[in-house]
Amino acid sequence: MKYVYLFLPAIGWGLMPLVIASVKNSTVYNQIVGTVAASFIFGAIVMAIMHPAMSWSLFLLSALGGACWVIGQVGQYISYEKIGVSETMPISTGLQLIGVPLVGVLAFGEWSSPQAKLYGFIGILVLIIGVVLTSFTDRGTSEGNKSNQVSTIILLVLTSLGYITSSSIPKALHGNSVSIFFGQTFGMLVAVFIYTLVTKNLHVWKEKSTVQSGGAGILYAIAALAYILSVQDNGVNMAFVISQLCVVISTLGGLIFLHEKKTRKGLIFTIAGLILIIGGAMLTTLF
């Protein structure tokens, strides 16, 4: 089963954007509410079955991480609409792969040896080049005009800070992984409720498109739980690197199944960028 747990996160997180993009007549509000509500229900069921111990400090910090995740996910969903899944995912994933290791080095003392620092910073450089390549837009693509692309990339950079914070908080926590996951889904639920309340979009909670978007939430939750189990069976480095293959599935899936168009030059740059992103991820985690 450890190999199932190893590859399930990449499959689930890779298919998640494709499921969201396939829901007709859905807005960002439908998508984020459906995703989060389904994730919370899944997390609550797992919590009820396994009954892990949980302290208030663990719960509150996990919830904070979940709230930060919502910031990143909203930015990603907006980007799907603006520039497409096939361009959003490599950029978003690359930014997270750059940010999370840097937080680990600065806040948690990771990459303690000179060799680890050397490979780590080379990996970050490779990741940056990969992100730049995947953001290349040639004429005839479906990503929109240049100003639209630049503004969307800026949005991704800013909202990816939410992802980075969400991924970094659990490193400071010591507790059952299922408890942390449930706390995160609760924080996600509260954050999304506040988001829809402030933007006066509470009506989306009962719309059909919101329910249909719940499929993405189930995929996210299953992948997240499988990732926790994969870390236990395969180690954090191997589990993390393999999970990042989700970017390949979502990017190629956007091109093949969602019919997002790129010219030959744009496609070459995208594939080259994907290879560099995966290579950079390996350098920053396996060495």
From Swiss-Prot:
The lineage of its organism: Bacteria, Bacillati, Bacillota, Bacilli, Lactobacillales. It comes from Lactobacillus johnsonii (strain CNCM I-12250 / La1 / NCC 533). It is a multi-pass membrane protein. SUPFAM superfamilies: Multidrug resistance efflux transporter EmrE. Belongs to the GRP transporter (TC 2.A.7.5) family. One of its GO terms (molecular function) is carbohydrate transmembrane transporter activity. The keyword Transcription regulation does not apply. Keywords: Cell membrane, Membrane, Sugar transport, Transmembrane, Transmembrane helix, Transport. Its main location: membrane. It is found in: Cell membrane. One of its GO terms (cellular component) is plasma membrane. The chain crosses the membrane at residues 4-23, 28-50, 56-78, 91-108, 118-137, 150-169, 179-198, 211-230, 240-259, 266-285. This is Putative sugar uptake protein LJ_0170.
